[in-house]
Structure formats: structure tokens, C-alpha cells
Amino acid sequence: MIVTTMVMVPGYNEPPEHFNLLRHGTPQVPGLESYGIDCITFGEFNDTLSERIDRFAEFISELKDKGRRFPIVLLGYSLGGLVVRGFLRRYPARAKEISHTIMIATPTWGVQTYMLPYIHAMLRTPDKAFGDMDLSSDFMKWLNGTGGHWEFTRRGWYDWVLDSEPWIGPHGAKMLSIAGLIPSRGYDNDGLVWADSATLGSRIPAHFIAGPHANHMNIIGHFDPFIMASKGFLANDRVWPLTLRTVTRFLGAQPRPRVEREPKV
């Protein structure tokens, strides 16, 4: 079986081990590796997003030098999705090295960070990429090629609207955004990232996972006690297998044959 190389980029202030469920799966639900996907994780760093993108580009070059099979698949979770799309933005000539780009729960045009500084200070997280996620940050304007503004709607609330048509990705790039939608938030966000932000205002092809447990953490099977307590998320294993299935279908991956041995009596 041909082995596909996938590089996985973790989210904000998160270790790569948070991908373990998607990678390895469980005895009941085999993970990505059972589909012949060689999963390599990018490390946890505390630099800015711009610096991290350059570091990521060097990482990809090292994989090529080591003889890994190319083109490769990029998968980024949350802030990690900004890194993989940022790589395509900064290094367009290298787009041919990437077969598929997958972003999970990624705020492609940013998030509102007015409450996050207090959480950031309380947790004392060292990640310098915090400010880059803001809707109005210079990084977001660079990534999308445009900024945005708030517009009051007839529905009685404000919508974030881009000032002009954004940069989406390299021509012909195979991209997919996977996002959760929970009923307690009106089925339009995962508790942290809005559907419009995850899809760049419906411009990036998307797959939505909807349900009471399809929150920002469960979508990759990562359970953070603090986030669970502060956001009221419920934790279980119902959602990440749906994410796994979405990824493998997008890649056209087939599971390897499983050999089950007859138990000894």
C-alpha cells in the first residue's frame, strides 16, 4: 500500500500529543495510521505566527531532504490551521509539494480576543501567537489580503464582513475546512470559532459536524478540563470519529486490511 505522509500542526499552546486519538485511534475505531497515513507532528512553539510559518517551511524542507514521500498532506487544528494556510500564502511556489490542506476548527479570518487576554494572563500561556488570532490583527490582514469591519444586521446583531474579496489559497489547491456546530450556540459555531470564520465566509469548501457534543475540543478528541469548565462543553468520544471519517474520505484513503485472530479457548 502506498504510504501518504501527513504533517499535523497543533493549536494554540497545545502539544502535538493532542493528535494521538486521530493518529492511533482505539481498538474499536482505528486511527489515521490504519489507512496507510504516516502522521508526523510539528512541535509546540511559543513564537509568533509569522515566525512559526517560516519554522514550519524549514520543517517541510527537512522532511523532503530525509526522503519522505511528496506531495504531502497538511492538517492543522485551530491555530495550526492558520500555520498551514499561512505556509501556502508565504510560499506559493511550494504549493506543488502539498496534495491536500485540511483545517480543523480554524478561525481563518480570526476570532474576537476581547475576553481571551484575561484567560491568557490567568493561565500564563507563553505562546506569542495569541495576538495574531485577533480579527483586526496585521497577521489576519496579511493572510487574507484584506481586513474587515462590523455591520449591523436586520436580525439585531453585528456581522463581521470582509472589506474586499480575500485570498483563499493557491489556484487548484485542494482545501477543506472541518468545523463543529453546537445547538447551544445556535448551530453557527463550536463554542470558540464561528462557522463564517472557519470557512472564510463560505469561500473554503467545508464539512460541518453538528450536535451537542461537536465543540472545539471534542472535534479532535482533546479534553481540556479548564475549557470544559469555562465553556460548559460536554466531553465524550462521539465526535472525533466523524472528523476522522471526514479526513479519510477527503483524501480518498482506504483502511488497511485488519487481521483478527481467533481467541484461544
Regions found by a protein language model. Give the residues of each.
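Short, solvent-exposed loop/turn and secondary-structure capping segments
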Residues: 18-20, 86, 113-115
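The conserved beta1-alpha1 loop
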Residues: 7-10, 77-78, 105, 190
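Gly/Ala-rich beta-loop-alpha elbow adjacent to hydrolase catalytic centers
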Residues: 76-80, 84
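A conserved amphipathic alpha-helix that caps or lines the catalytic cleft of carbohydrate-
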Residues: 60, 87-88
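Helical cap/lid subdomain of alpha/beta-hydrolase-fold lipid enzymes
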Residues: 89-265
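Active-site catalytic motif of lipid deacylating hydrolases and related acyltransferases
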Residues: 1-72
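A structural signal for isolated positions on well-ordered beta-strands in alpha/beta enzyme cores
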Residues: 7, 38, 73, 100-102, ...
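A generic "structured core" feature
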Residues: 72-74, 87
